[in-house]
C-alpha cells in the first residue's frame, strides 16, 4: 500500500473499528452482466472482504440503475411494462453476482420509494440553496411518438462525409462530431419520423456557481489516484477560468423515472437519481437491520464512504455527485477509485469473435468463477490502467498458480498426516522458520489488498507458495514415508506444509472466498480473519479428509465459452436494432449500405476488419517526449519534440492542450505514427501523430488520454 493511499484511507477514519460504506457503479437494467462489468465488482468485493477480515463494520451496497429512455423503449419493444423489464433484469443480475461471489449486503433498485424520497429531498435542498435554475432549451422532438429525443435517438446523413444512418452526435464512418441540428435528412430511431425542433423548460444544477467550484477545488486534493486528480483539475481549469458548465438534470415526459416536485411532466434525468440510488439501497438495508442511516450519511459523519467506478464515469462521480451531496447537507465521498477497461486477447470485446463474454455463459460452460476472480486480481492495481484477459495466459496462470503451486501443497501432505498421524499436526512444527516467514508476510499482503494493489499481493503470495513447494521437494515426504524410522521428520514436513497452506489460504481468501470456506472446513476452523495468522493449527484439532479443491482449466472449456458467445455480424446488426431501431429504420439499412460504402472509401474509415497487411503499413513507434510547449495563437495544440531512436528528433503538433500542461508530458513515453506524411501547418511542419484516446461522446465524457507504454519500452521500438 502506498503512503498516499494509506493516508487517504485512514485520514478520516476513527481509531479502531472503522465504519465503511462501499459501492460499485450501478449496472444498467437493460442488458446482461458481462466480464467487463465483473472487473469492477470483483475488484470492489476483494477490497470489501479485506476490510471485513480486519473486523471493520463494512456495508457493500449495490442496485440496478433502472430509469431512462433506453429502458422505456426496450420494454415497449418486448411488450412489457418498464417495471416488468427491470424486475426480470434484476433477477438476472443478482444471479450473476451471486455466481461470482460478489458479496453485496444489499442489492436493490433505483426504482424504489427510498430513492424517490431521497432524490426529491436532495433536489429541494439544492433548490433552497439557489443551485437550481430553469431555462428554455430547444430540442429534437418526435411528432409521432410525441417525445423529445436524446442525441443517440436521432440518425441521419453525416454533414461531413455524407454517410447514411449516422447518430445525432458523431459519425462512425469518418469520426466527425457535430450537433444534431447539423444532420442531413434526420429521422427518429424510435418511429422513423422526421424530428422537429421544439422548445421546453429544463432544470439545471448550477455547477458553475462559485460555491461549487470552490468546494470541488478543495475536495479534489483528497483523491487517492493522481490520474483522477489531474482529470478533475483539467475539468475545473485554472482559478477564475470558470470552465464548469451547469448540468441539465431534467427530461420531458414520456420518461421512465421520478417526476420532479412541482414540475408536472418533468422528470429527473437518470444520472441524478442513479448515484442517489447508493444511499437508497443503504437506506433500505438500514431500515431492515436497524442501522442508523442518518449517522452514516449526514455532514460531518465519521463513517467512511468509497465508490468504485470505471474511469468512463469519473466525471459524474467527482463533479456532480460530491457537489450534490455537499450542498444538500450530506457527507461527501471519502474517495473515489476508478479502474480501467477490459480487453480480451488484446482487443475490444467482440460478439463476432465470441469474446463479448456474458457472466452467465461463463458459468454455463462450467468454468470456475474463482479462476476469473484470481486472474483479474493478478492484473489489477490502484491505477486506471486497462487490463487484458488473455485466454491462453488465463489457462496457464490458473493451472500453474492455483493448481500446480497452491492446491498441490495440501494434496501432497494431507494423506500422509491422516494415514500416519491421525490427522493431527506436530505442534513444534508450527515454529518452523518457513512457517514464521509466511506468518510475518500476511500483514504486508493484507496492506497490498487494502491499497488495491492486488497484483502485488498475489505476486508475493505465489512467491511464498514457490518456497513452500521447494521445501516439500527438498524434504521428499513420499520418500520419508517408506521408512518408519523417519516418522518424526515426516510428521514435521506434513505439519509445516499444511500450516503453510493454511496461511496461503488466508492470503488468498479475499480473492477466492469459496475455496477459503472449503479450506476452513478441511481444517475444522472458524472463518479466517487476518488476526488468525498468529493462531496456528493445533494437534488438538485433527484435519478432515482432504477433498479436491480445484481442477485445471481444460482448453475445451475455453473453446466452448467462445462458441457460446460467438455471434454473426447479422446478429450484431439485430442487436443494434433492438437498442432502438424500428422496422421502418431497418428498411433503410439496405438502401444506405451502398452509400456508406462510398463514404467509407472516400474517407478511408471503416469498422470492418482489416488485414494484417493493412495494419503492417502503419509504422507505430515508441516515442519519448523530450520537450513540449504551448503553441502561441492556438487554444488546442501543443508542440512536441519526440525522440524515436533516429538521429534527429521529430516535431509533432497535437491537439491535447486541454488535457495536459506541457511540463506534465516532458520525459513521458508515448506511441506515435512514424510514417504519416508530414503536414505543413500554420505553426510549422508536423512530422507524425501521437496516439490519444477519448470517449465517443466527448461532450458527456470530456477528456483526452495519451497512450503510455509500460516502463522498459525504449524510443524507436516498433509497436506490433
Swiss-Prot record:
Q: Which residues bind Zn(2+)?
A: 158, 161, 171, 174
Q: Where does ATP bind?
A: 351
Q: Which residues cross the membrane?
A: none
Q: Where is this motif: 'HIGH' region?
A: 27-37
According to its UniProt record, which reaction does this protein catalyse? tRNA(Met) + L-methionine + ATP = L-methionyl-tRNA(Met) + AMP + diphosphate
Which keywords describe this protein according to UniProt? Aminoacyl-tRNA synthetase, ATP-binding, Cytoplasm, Ligase, Metal-binding, Nucleotide-binding, Protein biosynthesis, RNA-binding, tRNA-binding, Zinc
Q: Which PROSITE patterns match?
A: AA_TRNA_LIGASE_I (PS00178), TRBD (PS50886)
List localization entries: Cytoplasm
Q: What is its EC number?
A: 6.1.1.10
Q: For the tRNA-binding domain, which residue ranges apply?
A: 614-720
Among InterPro entries, the record links this protein to: aa-tRNA-synth_I_CS (IPR001412), Anticodon_Met (IPR041872), M/V/L/I-tRNA-synth_anticd-bd (IPR013155), Met-tRNA-synth_bsu_C (IPR004495), Met-tRNA_ligase_1 (IPR023458), Met-tRNA_synth (IPR014758), Methionyl/Leucyl_tRNA_Synth (IPR015413), MetRS_core (IPR033911)
What is known about its subunit structure? Homodimer.
Q: Supply the NCBIfam families for this chain.
A: metG, metG_C_term, PRK00133.1
Protein known as: Methionine--tRNA ligase
Q: Which organism is it from?
A: Burkholderia ambifaria (strain ATCC BAA-244 / DSM 16087 / CCUG 44356 / LMG 19182 / AMMD)
Highest classification ranks of the organism: Bacteria, Pseudomonadati, Pseudomonadota, Betaproteobacteria, Burkholderiales
